[in-house]
């Protein structure tokens, strides 16, 4: 897999275990030292791989940054539609699992650090990280979540007029103001760290609004 700066739309990218290990190292460099710390030489040294392998896998530095963000977003998993919508109970479990993984990614140290870094660069015209976090992160996840909800509506498990509106409601119920408080340096409470419990409450409330 080779990723260029232009390849930042919604196509699926499958990383090998070795590539995932390298991208974890890249995330670590970004969190610790910011975007300037993510160099091919530094990553090759930290991940114990050659610069040639990095170029082969990810292309140039923009491609590497795109791959890092795509890898982080890929930690939110989506099941095949046929499996997710087998019955009403299964669909609800998958929706809860999605909300749990979304919270795990958003509330995790890595995501918080990446968002802080992007916010710090928001007044720059070349804020590549911010654009990638939107396109390869937020927009990709929301597009897949809308598709999951549409599948649930098609099977009669949910009722809504607009999938984007329904998703934003679920997002708000699950995330609330916790993410912004984490970005501002506040620690999550013990209750807020119970991600599955928070997701279940959010989905319960969501079904009161949109359950068929």
Segment roles from a protein language model:
Residues 63, 97, 113-117, 165-169, ...:
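Amphipathic alpha-helical interaction segments
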Residues 35, 58, 119-125, 136-137:
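Short helix-capping/turn signature of helix-turn-helix
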Residues 1-9, 97, 101, 143, ...:
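C-terminal peripheral helix-coil segments that are non-catalytic and often amphipathic
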Residues 104, 108-113, 117, 127-154, ...:
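Amphipathic alpha-helical packing segments from all-alpha helical-bundle domains
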Residues 20, 24, 116:
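Short alpha-helical elements of helix-turn-helix
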Residues 10, 69-98, 106, 145-148:
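Amphipathic alpha-helical linker/stalk segments
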Residues 70, 92-125, 174-178, 208:
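Helical hydrophobic small-molecule/effector-binding pocket
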Residues 21, 29-63, 67, 71:
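Helix-turn-helix
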